[in-house]
């Protein structure tokens, strides 16, 4: 099982399960991911820095390495073999080159239990679990470049975005579908902030856009064709080469649209202020 930061649709549960399934060589359906209980979390810094994949993957690896080291010790005792002769395979541990000599993770967990009938070597504590903390040496650096093609109605000033492109480098893509979804979702949010959304007040200071009937969020009909191009430059600062990708889409669009509008109006020598 894995505890996770509170997600808001990023796909934490899927990505963290992918890391664990790969490290333990088990099907993803055998991995259980639990969302952190905010009433019991002793440290919480908010949803910032696009860091969940970086920090959680590091913690999953440290915890997995710790538990697997113990699991190999117990499996060696169960199979009467040297740890150096063992390998992970088939949702468990087996003797290299001998397919029939094998124990599953379930077998090893049972062998690690407390009690007189356990199969732990002398000096090995009961249980097969670990709580680990990952403290990266510094932040990772993700990069993105955005461009928009806009059309402006000369009579009304209406702005239409004909195409929007983002090139994004988030290191290793653990799940390309989720990566696309998060970047595109951020772009839509950024487009809304740049063109539609406004906290409007009257001259008495009363909020005029206090409901979704008045505060214009982008809908499917407002979203232009979006192209996301992923580059994969692994980060050297963590074991998997991952980086965050939650901010490039949301931050850039207002500035990109403003620059595109200025460029379109260049023949008229108009200035955007």
Regions found by a protein language model. Name each.
Residues 1-4:
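Structural motif
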Residues 13-14:
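Conserved strand-to-helix beginnings and helix N-cap segments that scaffold or border functional pockets
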Residues 18-273:
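C-terminal catalytic domains of large/alpha subunits in multi-subunit enzymes
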């Amino acid at each position: 099982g894995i505890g996770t930061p509170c997600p808001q649709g990023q796909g934490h549960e899927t990505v963290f399960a992918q890391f664990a399934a790969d490290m333990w060589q088990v099907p993803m359906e055998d991995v259980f991911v639990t969302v952190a209980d905010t009433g019991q979390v002793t440290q919480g810094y908010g949803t910032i820095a696009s860091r969940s994949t970086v920090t959680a993957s590091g913690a999953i690896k440290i915890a997995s390495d710790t538990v697997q080291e113990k699991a190999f010790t117990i499996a060696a005792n169960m199979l009467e073999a040297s740890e150096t002769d063992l390998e992970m395979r088939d949702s468990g541990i087996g003797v290299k080159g001998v397919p029939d000599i094998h124990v599953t993770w379930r077998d090893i967990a049972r062998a690690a239990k407390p009690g007189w009938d356990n199969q732990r070597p002398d000096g090995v504590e009961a249980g097969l679990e670990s709580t680990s903390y990952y403290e990266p040496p510094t932040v990772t650096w993700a990069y993105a470049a955005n461009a928009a093609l806009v059309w402006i109605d000369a009579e009304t000033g209406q702005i239409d975005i004909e195409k929007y492109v983002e090139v994004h480098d988030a290191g290793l893509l653990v799940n390309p579908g989720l990566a696309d979804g998060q970047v595109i979702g951020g772009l839509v949010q950024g487009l809304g902030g740049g063109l539609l959304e406004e906290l409007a007040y009257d001259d008495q200071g009363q909020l005029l856009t206090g409901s979704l009937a008045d505060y214009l969020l982008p809908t499917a009909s407002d979203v232009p064709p979006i192209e996301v191009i992923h580059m994969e430059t692994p980060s050297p600062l963590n074991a998997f080469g991952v980086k965050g990708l939650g901010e490039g889409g949301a931050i850039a669009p207002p500035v990109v649209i403003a620059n595109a509008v200025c460029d379109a109006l260049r023949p008229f020598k108009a200035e955007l202020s």
